[in-house]
């Protein structure tokens, strides 16, 4: 969420210029590269400007085929099944608190995580995405309120040199409409204890 402060391990996938503050042009390639795992939650620089940090879940590896059919996720022509966890829950979509349905999804490598959808049953379809060499395909867990790799003009496929690191946990979270980590005199109103010191799955 907006207002979350994250601990990110930048060594998880090797190093690129984006591993350093302000992305200095030290080198153009990625060194000591380690391949990320499907299901990792990763911070990356969006390809549109190479400056903005995004945090999303890695779904597609190079060569993978990804498609949504009737709002169900298909990976390499196999459906990623989801089971309902809660009939209704509330989450933030931007600044608005909205009702959602919460599901658990399981990837082929056994990775389980929760996703949320605005409706119990939707009929969302997409074109087939084929991930290019050295690129990755990311999705937000908030499927109906996420700008991610499905939007090719703004995010699209992410090159490995744009990876910043693996998100490990949220160490501080506050409602930015009230205050932030620096306005400590407002913490009693702004801090979100249910999200602070929370491990990222």
Language-model features, listed with the residues they occupy:
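Soluble "head" domains of membrane/secretory-pathway proteins
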Residues: 2-201
């Amino acid at each position: 969420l907006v207002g979350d402060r994250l601990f990110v391990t930048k060594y998880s996938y090797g190093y690129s210029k984006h591993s350093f503050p302000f992305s200095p042009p030290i080198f153009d390639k990625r060194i000591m590269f380690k391949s990320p795992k499907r299901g990792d939650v990763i911070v990356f620089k969006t390809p549109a400007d190479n400056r903005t940090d995004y945090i999303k879940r890695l779904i597609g590896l190079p060569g993978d085929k990804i498609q949504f059919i009737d709002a169900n996720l298909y990976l390499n022509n196999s459906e990623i099944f989801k089971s309902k966890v809660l009939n209704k829950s509330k989450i933030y979509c931007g600044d608005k608190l909205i009702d959602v349905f919460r599901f658990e999804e399981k990837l082929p490598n056994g990775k389980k995580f929760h996703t949320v959808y605005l409706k119990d049953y939707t009929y969302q379809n997409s074109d087939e995405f084929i991930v290019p060499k050295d690129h990755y395909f990311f999705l937000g867990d908030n499927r109906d309120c996420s700008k991610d790799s499905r939007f090719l003009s703004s995010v699209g496929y992410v090159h490995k040199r744009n990876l910043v690191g693996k998100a490990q946990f949220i160490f501080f979270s506050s409602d930015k409409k009230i205050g932030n980590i620096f306005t400590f005199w407002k913490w009693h109103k702004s801090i979100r204890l249910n999200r602070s010191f929370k491990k990222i799955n």
